[in-house]
Amino acid sequence: VIDAVAVEIDAEAVVVRAARPLVVVSSAVAGGGLGRARALVNLRVPRDVDCATVGARLAEFARRRDLPTPWVGLCTAAATERAEVVTERADDVTATAIATVGLSNPVSAGLSARAAWRPATINTLVLVDAAPAPAALVNLVATVTEAKVLALLDAGVRLPDGALPSGTSTDAIVVAATGRGPACPYGGPVTAVGWAVARAVRAAVGTGARRWLEARR
């Protein structure tokens, strides 16, 4: 997908391993925030998992699979073996989106009532072969979110009451950059890096959403 970055997908997890540390911004449950990571994990867990055990589950998985440290970890009840992987390029920038999509708890931000955490979710890992500035990394999180919402609308996802979706109640995003290649001061949707990221995310999430809906018709 991207040189010196390996992606492993199976029924247990989506794993990204990097030969050199990636610069990462994420909302991950383990290792989230802004930092560096040699591995990214999106671990499948039971739908009724006790959220207090998620950190320990991720740590046990990391040990068993011998993941390099530091690592960033997410969890999902969606089928990880059905992760959608899309790569897009713009100018000298390459972006890969890896999305797992579960839509059993869709929400409309600002309308849906507060609720307990659930692992059925949309998790989006984005790999960028470029050198975005810290502010651009944050900007890319917004770009990923915009593309995700549009993908759901395009796929025809709606809440039971007909409201438009913004995602699910527990969506998570990871944006990880190699730090090599072109410098990117901005990450909006019409920059080279933002354009590549948005197209990859929109395609990956859209395909995953349509597949989820079709399986339940």
What is each model feature region?
Residues 1-217:
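Alpha/propeptide regions of enzymes that mature by internal proteolysis
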